Amino acid sequence: MNIYDQLQAVEDRYEELGELLSDPEVVSDTKRFMALSKEEASTRETVAAYRQYKAIIQSIDDAEEMIKEAGGDPDIEEMAKEELKEAKAAKETYEDKLKLLLLPKDPNDDKNIILEIRGAAGGDEAALFAGDLLAMYQKFAESQGWRFEVMEASYNGVGGIKEVVAMVSGQSVYSKLKYESGAHRVQRVPVTESQGRVHTSTATVLVMPEVEEVEYDIDPKDLRIDIYHASGAGGQNVNKVATAVRIVHLPTNIKVEMQEERTQQKNRDKAMKIIRARVADHFAQIAQDEQDAERKSTIGTGDRSERIRTYNFPQNRVTDHRIGLTLQKLDTILSGKLDEIVDALVLYDQTQKLESLNNQ
């Protein structure tokens, strides 16, 4: 099926959906009505663009016919040629637009995310860099009008981050931050380095779409839930009532501990959000690993341990190794201005997918 057959099939389905949504039997079935409404909304832009494209094709045919029938009238011929030129330019623009609209939509693109950052190789310096990344994502979220909530964090003795888990909520969060998963390498002179030598350290970032309970159901029998007293600095118990929660998903041994909130229920709710996302992500990663051909068409290898980016402080340089992008503005990027990198990654991903579509 070529691209135009696909577009015609989308339009046919759109018209069918319009009829179904006016059917009293469908209207009375709330669940089905909502599902069909969502499907119709997701194809509306594509259908509108395709109809405009067909109108442009008709304009080309009309202009060519007018040139043939001009009968030597230079004014009519010139006007028709100008219309033909404009219509052909519009045709090219709409062909590119339609190809993009036909690309498979990532069903997670509109979702909120669970963001995890960990200091990895490099000890204290890695933990300090993890803190820099946390601040970078917080500032980027603020610039996008998103809500950024730290759900759980553990720090080392110098104020660096061993591990932090955050929820980022807002419009199209996953679509912009999904490319951030991987190993982020930093090259700089640590404050504790007396010889001025540049050290290399690493922090890892994991971005997972938030998973609602209705989307991914975990069997309660697969969970072990422990309740214990929250502890403060030095390990002392800070609550007389046991409010901290530990949840273990037994089949995968994925574990989440939560003690940030004052009540057991709030800690349990947050822990369930994280474990649901982690378990769903775990099985999604297994499925992705089994689809080698699909992985080759995405940015990077898909390996969570893959080094995706280097932040070189002496050269004020950031390099994204997956797309060969180098920017001499590290200070700007760490201040939360990630748009240039995000836009380049989205464009690269779309280009790769367009090539796959054209090769079909």
From Swiss-Prot:
**Basic and acidic residues bias (residue ranges):** 293-308
GO CC field: cytoplasm
Q: Which InterPro entries match?
A: PCRF (IPR005139), Pep_chain_release_fac_I (IPR000352), Pep_chain_release_fac_I_sf (IPR045853), Prokaryotic/Mito_RF (IPR050057), RF-1 (IPR004373)
Does the record carry Cytoplasm as a key word? yes
Region of interest: Disordered: 288-308
Q: Which residues carry this modification: N5-methylglutamine?
A: Q236
| Coiled coil region boundaries | none
* Biological role stated in the UniProt entry: Peptide chain release factor 1 directs the termination of translation in response to the peptide chain termination codons UAG and UAA.
PANTHER family named among the record's database cross-references:
LD18447P (PTHR43804:SF7)
Q: Which HAMAP family match?
A: Rel_fac_1
Family membership, please give it.
Belongs to the prokaryotic/mitochondrial release factor family.
This protein is called: Peptide chain release factor 1
Task: Name the species this protein comes from.
Answer: Streptococcus equi subsp. zooepidemicus (strain MGCS10565)
Q: Provide the taxonomic classification.
A: Bacteria, Bacillati, Bacillota, Bacilli, Lactobacillales
Gene assigned in the entry: prfA
